[in-house]
C-alpha cells in the first residue's frame, strides 16, 4: 500500500475518534442538524476504520507467520505457511476494499430523489410501459424500506402514464437509483395487437437528487412565474373545486414544473419549488458530467436521458443493460422490483471507472 494512502487512512482514523467524541457532547446532542451531520460522517468513516484495523491485524499476522518459519518443529512451520497464505489473501482483499472505500463520494448519494418517467415513442403502449416501470421502482423502493409519493401524474388513455413524477425518500436512495436515468425500451406484443406482432416502445427516466438548502441552489423570486390551475385526474371530491394545482416556470432556463397531487395550494407550491431546485441541481450535475466525459469515457454515469440504456424483451423474458453488456433472463423478477442484480453491477462498473481515473492521474 502506498504511503500516501496510509497517511490518508491514519487521518481518517483520527477524524473518526474526533467525531465519536463530539457525538457525546451535550451541545451537539441538542443541535439536531449538527448531530445528524456528524452521525452521517461517523457512519461513513466506520467501515473505513474497521477495514483498516483488519488490514493492520493481517500485516501483524503475516509478520508473526514469517517468524514462525524459522522454527525447527516441522508442524509449526507447516502451520506458519498456512497462516502466511491466509494473511496474504486477507491483505490483498482488504487493500482492494480500502481502495473502494477511499473513492471520492458523490455528495448527493444520501439524497432523496425525484423520479420522472415519461412515455416516449410507441403511443398507448409507451404509456402502459411507463406505468409498468413506475410499479417496478415502487416495488424496489418497498423492498429497500423507502417511501414513495406521487407528485404529479398525467394518465394514459388506455392505462399507465404519459408522465409521472414521484418523490422517493429513505437511506441512500440516489446512490442506488442514479444510474437509472436514460431511455428504457420495451419489446412485446401489446394486449390490443390481434396479429401477435411485437411492438417496440420507449420511455425516458430521469433521476434527480432532491436539492435542499445545503446545495446552494438559490432561486431569485423575480426569476420565477407561478400559475395556478385546477387539478385533474383522480382525487375524489377535491378535484376541480379549487385552483390548488401549481405550475412554476423558471424564466432564465425555461424549466417548468407542476404539482397537483397535494390537497392544498401551499403544499403544492412547496413541492413544486423543491422539484424545481432539484431540476436545476440536476442540470448542474449534467454539465459537470459532460465536462468529465470530454476528457474520459464514463460508460455508466453519463445520465443522458436520450441514451438508450436498457431493453426489456418480453417474448424472450430478457432484460439487457447496454452500458455494461449485461443480459439477464429474469425479466419477470426484475419487473417485480428485483433490481439489485442490475444496479449492483452498474455501481461496481462505476467504481472501476473511478479507480482507473485515479490510477491515470
UniProtKB/Swiss-Prot annotation:
Post-translational modification as stated in the protein's UniProt record: Methylated by PrmC. Methylation increases the termination efficiency of RF1.
Gene Ontology cellular-component annotations: cytoplasm
Major site of localization recorded for this protein: cytoplasm
Compositionally biased region (Basic and acidic residues): 287-297
SS bond list: none
Entry superkingdom: Bacteria
Residues with the N5-methylglutamine modification: 237
Cellular localization per UniProt: Cytoplasm
Region: Disordered, residue numbers: 287-307
InterPro entries per record: PCRF, Pep_chain_release_fac_I, Pep_chain_release_fac_I_sf, Prokaryotic/Mito_RF, RF-1
SUPFAM superfamilies: Release factor
Pfam family, one: PCRF
Record keywords: Cytoplasm, Methylation, Protein biosynthesis
GO molecular function, one term: translation release factor activity, codon specific
Family: Belongs to the prokaryotic/mitochondrial release factor family.
PANTHER family xref list: LD18447P
NCBIfam families in UniProt: prfA, PRK00591.1
Function: Peptide chain release factor 1 directs the termination of translation in response to the peptide chain termination codons UAG and UAA.
Protein name per the record: Peptide chain release factor 1
The organism of origin for this protein: Francisella philomiragia subsp. philomiragia (strain ATCC 25017 / CCUG 19701 / FSC 153 / O#319-036)
Record lineage: Bacteria, Pseudomonadati, Pseudomonadota, Gammaproteobacteria, Thiotrichales
Gene this protein is translated from: prfA
